[in-house]
Amino acid sequence: MANVLRTVYTNFASGELNPLLNARTDASAYFNGAKKLRNWYLLDEGGLMRRPGTSYKATLPGSSRIIPFIFSNDEMAIFALSNNRLDVFDSAGASVQSNITSNCNWTTAQLFELNYAQFGDTVFIVHRNNPIVKIVRASASSFSVSLFAFEEDDTVTVGGINKTTQPFFKYADSAITVTPAATSGTGITLTASADTFVSGHNGTYLTIAGKQVKITGFTSATQVTITILETLASTSAEADFAEQLISSVRGFPQAVSFHDNRLWFAGARDKPSAVVASQIGGYFNFDLGTGLANEGINVSITGDTVNE
């Protein structure tokens, strides 16, 4: 009778292995994994534990996505995102807040395209086609949903409009110029040398030679009305102009993260290679300032292909 060779495996840290590794006995993962694992949890120590059962907690309205909210070691919550709706549960599955719909701008089709980042009591949720959403914990039983807004500089204000601290980019062709009818004031006509504007630009900011203006009226693809927040150098045609990197016209970021005490956005719909970061400790202030180490960052990641 043939002897049976038995080998004891005690480490499954590599989890379930790709079938392409079936013959890779030279790979360390081969001896620390399994061909198939069903209804098991991997332990940090390398062992396995049977998956526990589940219990009914709530009925969600159609397709949903669950994301964690960990405020502290002893306070955690569960966000259930569904079509234009947010439900909040505690870690035991009890409902904390239900049917929050205000500013929940995601659709069922977008649920698993959303990205999010948490810092303390705040979660940011992004999608390239939607304004950035901010969820804030007021208490263990109270959460609010609002749209993200860049910080404003109220030391620079004209006609009740403040200077913004958001990032800018010139989407228009490099040869296109804009010509202001005056160097300061409100209700000033701005004329572009080629089709540049759409109605959605109304209410957005521009920079002209580094000076901020805000569009307050749309006339045509080549003409808008502006409020000049910082005095312009001249009324000559100027090629050095830029518009908001992030807007309803150009789309919104697809990626968000906190790193080095900054809030980062990337993958904007119309400029997917753009990566921008807030000032250190000022998560709503993306002003580049004079380029000091603690000020905002606005760069493009270049490569052979354009990726998000």
Regions found by a protein language model. Give the residues of each.
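A generic structural motif
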Residues: 187-192, 220-231
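Elongated alpha-helical scaffolds
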Residues: 81, 104-133, 263
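Blade-loop segments of beta-propeller domains
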Residues: 67, 74, 93-116
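Extended Gly/Ser/Thr-rich low-complexity repeat segments
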Residues: 196-210, 233-248
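Generic recognition of flexible, low-complexity loop/linker segments
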Residues: 112, 203, 213, 251-254, ...
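N-terminal beta-propeller domains
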Residues: 1-96, 134, 138-187, 228, ...
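Ser/Thr/Gly-rich low-complexity blocks that favor extended beta-strand/coil architectures
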Residues: 130-138, 194-223
